[in-house]
């Protein structure tokens, strides 16, 4: 690895090397468009046949605050959080100190060296690599927003070189991701190549920590819990969904609608054989579900803790009237409004003793997407 790179900065090459068994953490700014790039990175590893999982750590705001995305690569299929970070991509200068401290001994930190911070980002047991993502994108793209967005794809390109990712898989995923917006494919491909070519030219690639093709994901799909729950509703015969948007459950109904558009239409006429209603509040949503089940339909509603509280009266009605309603509670943290972008298991007793009087509800606790 060259220590004389013009723009790249390399310090203390100590990468111990972990093939198909490491954690990548990406430090970004919320609202900077990094979600698509991070998802693309994870899907690339999956398409290369290696078990992988992702975890988002993000604030309850629209943009501006720090956000992190963690990807665990595990050839053995261990997909829970491991507690270590082997490769850190630090794209937020506000969190440099924290990001550097999280890297495991022998790990690697990659940062945007458009503004060199080699003195700030220094640790004897960590390899620090600087790549000028902002400068590369500023020189290539003219629109300000495009420059911000393409920085994310540029670091995916650099990681493709550094981690030995299959570039053809990356390109295929870009084409799939932006199939409905073909005008964006070219710019994203350019950004990938910017990052890849810079890393390949200035550093020894791949790193000792890298991805090698396996065949352990054959016959598998990549899916999160909310999407899996929505797919389960389709397989279970649900035709009615009523809801009121609330984080972190909103994507359940988004996914259910998407699946219904594919699998709940009359094959001859194209008519929809499903009903999805956005109610005025959670109490109305559960009321619509009860009305649907009373008329013989299989119906459900997704919600979170505050919504579950509002549904208590009608949950008692469902018990008393023997209506088989399904409530999917995607839990957040805390009482009252709580923390919508954090998770815990604080709703268990509320779900078990929902409504007043003597009632009993069947409670199911999925431990993984397959059980959803």
Residue ranges, per PLM feature:
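Active-site cofactor/cluster-binding pocket
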Residues: 2-236, 240-242
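Hydrophobic transmembrane signal anchors and adjacent membrane-proximal interface regions, especially
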Residues: 126, 234, 245, 274, ...
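Active-site oxyanion-binding pockets that recognize sulfate/phosphate
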Residues: 181, 362-366
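Flexible glycine/proline-enriched surface loops and loop-helix/loop-strand junctions
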Residues: 357-361
């Amino acid at each position: 690895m060259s220590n004389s790179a013009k723009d790249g900065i390399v310090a203390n090459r100590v990468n111990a090397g972990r093939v198909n068994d490491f954690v990548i953490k990406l430090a970004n700014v919320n609202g900077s468009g990094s979600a698509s790039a991070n998802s693309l990175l994870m899907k690339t590893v999956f398409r290369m046949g290696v078990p992988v999982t992702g975890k988002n750590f993000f604030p309850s705001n629209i943009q501006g605050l720090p956000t992190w995305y963690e990807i665990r690569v595990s050839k053995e299929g261990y997909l829970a959080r491991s507690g270590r970070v082997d490769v850190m991509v630090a794209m937020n200068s506000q969190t440099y100190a924290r990001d550097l401290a999280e890297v495991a001994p022998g790990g690697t930190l990659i940062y945007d060296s458009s503004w060199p911070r080699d003195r700030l980002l220094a640790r004897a047991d960590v390899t620090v690599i600087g790549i000028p993502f902002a400068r590369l994108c500023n020189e290539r793209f003219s629109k300000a927003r495009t420059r911000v967005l393409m920085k994310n794809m540029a670091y995916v390109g650099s990681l493709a070189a550094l981690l030995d990712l299959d570039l053809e898989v990356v390109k295929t995923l870009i084409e799939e991701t932006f199939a409905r917006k073909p005008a964006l494919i070219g710019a994203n491909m350019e950004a990938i190549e910017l990052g890849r070519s810079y890393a390949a030219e200035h550093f020894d690639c791949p790193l000792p920590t890298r991805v090698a093709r396996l065949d352990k994901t054959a016959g598998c799909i990549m899916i999160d819990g909310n999407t899996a729950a929505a797919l389960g509703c389709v397989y279970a015969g649900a035709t009615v969904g009523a809801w009121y948007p609330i984080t972190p459950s909103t994507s359940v109904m988004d996914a259910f609608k998407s699946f219904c558009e594919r699998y709940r239409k009359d094959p001859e006429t194209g008519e929809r054989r499903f009903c999805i209603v956005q109610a005025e509040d959670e109490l109305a949503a559960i009321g619509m579900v009860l009305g649907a089940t009373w008329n013989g339909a299989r119906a459900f509603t997704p919600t979170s803790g505050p919504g579950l509280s509002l549904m208590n009266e009608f949950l008692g009605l469902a018990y008393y009237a023997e209506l088989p309603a399904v409530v999917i509670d995607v839990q957040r943290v805390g009482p009252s409004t709580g923390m919508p972008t954090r998770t815990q298991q604080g709703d268990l007793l509320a779900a078990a003793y929902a409504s007043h009087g003597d009632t009993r509800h069947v409670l199911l606790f999925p431990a993984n997407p397959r059980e959803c």
